[in-house]
């Protein structure tokens, strides 16, 4: 099964996510997303970056956060997701050694 990755130019990315080029420059500078490729004169973004930016835009509208606040919130949300996954895996490993009533 082949993986397909959709890529966007800056203009396509901004149209797809609803952000301006200035906002895109700011969130790239904050590390919210990174270009998949840096071509000679432009950036190219993948579909994962579009999902992250759409999530960021939702946070901006729902919580009225600025872009630096959104960068922190997304980092914390990702950390929580990783910790939950690690906790789930550790519980599964522990359950092998603990007798269930």
From Swiss-Prot:
Q: What induces this protein's gene, according to its Swiss-Prot or TrEMBL record?
A: In late stationary phase.
* GO molecular function annotations of the record: enzyme inhibitor activity
Query: Gene3D superfamilies given for it?
Result: 1.10.1660.10
Give the source's domain of life in one word.
Answer: Bacteria
Name of one Pfam family that matches: MerR_2
- Role played: Interacts with CbpA and inhibits both the DnaJ-like co-chaperone activity and the DNA binding activity of CbpA. Together with CbpA, modulates the activity of the DnaK chaperone system. Does not inhibit the co-chaperone activity of DnaJ.
Could you say which protein family the record assigns here?
Belongs to the CbpM family.
Q: What is this protein called?
A: Chaperone modulatory protein CbpM
- In its UniProt entry, the species of origin is given as Escherichia coli (strain K12)
Gene name per UniProt: cbpM
């Amino acid at each position: 099964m082949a993986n397909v990755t959709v890529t966007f130019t800056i203009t396509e990315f901004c149209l797809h996510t609803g952000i301006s080029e200035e906002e895109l420059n700011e969130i790239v500078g904050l590390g919210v997303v990174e270009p998949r490729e840096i071509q000679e004169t432009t950036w190219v973004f993948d579909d994962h970056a579009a999902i992250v930016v759409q999530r960021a835009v939702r946070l901006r509208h729902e919580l009225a956060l600025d872009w630096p606040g959104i960068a922190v919130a997304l980092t914390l949300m990702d950390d929580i997701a990783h910790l939950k996954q690690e906790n789930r895996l550790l519980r599964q490993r522990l359950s092998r050694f603990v007798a269930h009533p």
